């Protein structure tokens, strides 16, 4: 069930320029939340901005009843959210959306995150490792100071590689180039999970299809209702017979 509740901010930190990590006390959400789902946040006490902001659940701590969100300041809503302080309450709805589907038979998992696209992938990595999978994570960023989550993934036990567009840190080039190289080197995952810019996801899907590897993507869309009813956030998808919106 989708809940509409108030949650308290336990911590907030600017982890990279204009990118914030928040820890929220939300035991009601942690009970049912799955990696890949999101919450819908009201960013101010009045009705401006009118629409809630959809933010991925970055990490789920069921024992403590806490969730983490990782977000980038891109407009009025996220700017207001970044100004919140420890102890403030947030009006949220969630958990919403389809979570990632980790197949029981999958032994090797590849996770690819571009920019703020790493947001939903830490919870996925943690759950995959909990299930005994071997996990490899590829992170892409424009430059070194915008690389997010490298240490967090490593602490969980994943092997992590990083690509920066300008070559200021580790592999020089796009994360899709690093992804292609990793597959060509023979590291064949049973499943690939990705989140990031649409151009990145398109390239990932092309390479995964060519290599005949199952892949799932998490897409970022502007939202109104958050549940697909108003058709504001639906994406055009291809099924075996036709194209439809989901």
Indicate residue ranges for each PLM-predicted region:
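Short glycine/proline-enriched turns and hinge-like loops at secondary-structure junctions
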Residues: 19, 33-35, 50-51, 102-105, ...
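Local cysteine-cluster metal-coordination motifs and their immediate loop/turn environment
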Residues: 198-199, 221-246
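FNR/FR-type flavoprotein reductase catalytic core
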Residues: 76-222
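Short, charged beta-turn/beta-strand-edge "cap" motif at the junction between a beta-strand
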Residues: 44-48, 94-99, 239
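Active-site donor-binding loop signature of nucleotide-sugar glycosyltransferases
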Residues: 26, 165, 235
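Ferredoxin-reductase
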Residues: 2-86
